[in-house]
Amino acid sequence: MGTVNINSSINNNIIENNTNNVKNNSNALDLQKNFLSLLMAQMKNQDPTDPIKNSELTSQLAQINTATGIERLNSTVGIFSNKINQSQNIQVSSLIGHHVMIPSSQIVHTKGIETKYGIELISDATAVNIQITDKNGKIIHIQKIKNLKSGIHSLTWDGQNLDKEDMKTEKYNVTVIAKNQNREIPVQVLSEALVNSIITSSSIDPIIDLGTVGTVTLSKIRKILK
């Protein structure tokens, strides 16, 4: 009858367990490295108006192998949360000098220059009626458009009133009524503005300085113009 070497058996079990632990740790590290590489690529190509959120990052990280432990996971989340904020701030800063569309029923007109603005339709419209009025409520411009699809549409006002006179530099009000057949549909007026500067913070949505238009948060930007 053969004999069993207990010490050898124990040593073999220890070696096997250590090998499995190394493999598991290696797999966990590989998963993390792959995840982090994909995350960095996603951050570089993300939409600055809809950046990846810390909560999304945490959810994705929680699904990878946890062999490295919760403490290490939390540390990783903290590090990459900071990287996300830094990357977002860099991308948002690139908006400086660009024109954007934001929700506003007021447009800022400069005399002698065409004024761009827009509307956002929730659904298709068969008829859109637009009126621009001055601060006294006097109608100075009327425009009628047929058959517009849902989405954002850029429009232009030549800056003249109904008598073809150039209007002075100031703010004007825009009223829009959109209908699909006889049913009125929701519509949002959009004002164009130039991004002058950005105020960033790790705890709040970046603040966009639009000069005479005022300030808005990044999430309010509906369209970035070239």
Curated annotation (Swiss-Prot):
Instruction: Check the record and name the InterPro entries matching this protein.
Output: FlgD, FlgD/Vpr_Ig-like, FLgD_Tudor
Q: Which GO terms describe its biological process?
A: bacterial-type flagellum organization
Q: Which domain of life does the protein's organism represent?
A: Bacteria
Q: Does the keyword Repressor apply?
A: no
Q: Keywords, A to Z?
A: Bacterial flagellum biogenesis
| Any Pfam family matching the protein | FLgD_tudor
Q: Hey, what's the signal peptide range on this chain?
A: none
Q: Does the keyword Ribonucleoprotein apply?
A: no
For this chain, the family text in UniProt reads: Belongs to the FlgD family.
State the function annotated in the UniProt record: Required for flagellar hook formation. May act as a scaffolding protein.
Q: What is this protein called?
A: Basal-body rod modification protein FlgD
